């Protein structure tokens, strides 16, 4: 019975540590940082460089608001002006409505030409779009 408890505890710890942060990769597959499930954004050295709050606020490393993601996918700058939008299919548009890329369901991030510019697997599409297109933390 004790061995079973230890085994279950080990599995729970492995699952919890895997769910804590997802690696963000550039087009060559190299890690350019991590986004934790609580929204903390870390650079490739592991230092906190910002965060996505649960209300959509995007903060820099000093905690100042630098933008916001609305519930409809609109991305705003610190002044509240719309700078883009993430549509439900992952298409990313700039403030004029032109497509500038896409975040696919598997986390692949593509530019407007369809070329892969990175990977953000297991991360909210809106967070990935903000990270790669509007607020480059890497």
Language-model features: where?
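Long terminal segments
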Residues: 2-48, 54-65, 71-83, 88-138
């Amino acid at each position: 019975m004790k061995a079973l408890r230890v085994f279950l505890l080990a599995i729970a710890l492995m699952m919890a540590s895997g769910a804590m942060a997802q690696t963000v990769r550039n087009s060559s597959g190299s890690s350019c940082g991590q986004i934790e499930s609580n929204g903390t954004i870390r650079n490739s050295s592991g230092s906190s460089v910002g965060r996505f709050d649960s209300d959509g606020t995007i903060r820099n490393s000093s905690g100042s608001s630098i933008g916001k993601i609305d519930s409809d996918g609109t991305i705003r700058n610190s002044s509240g002006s719309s700078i883009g939008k993430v549509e439900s299919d992952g298409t990313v548009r700039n403030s004029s409505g032109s497509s500038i890329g896409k975040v696919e369901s598997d986390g692949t991030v593509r530019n407007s030409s369809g070329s892969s510019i990175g990977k953000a697997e297991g991360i909210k599409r809106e967070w990935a779009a903000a990270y790669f297109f509007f607020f480059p933390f890497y």
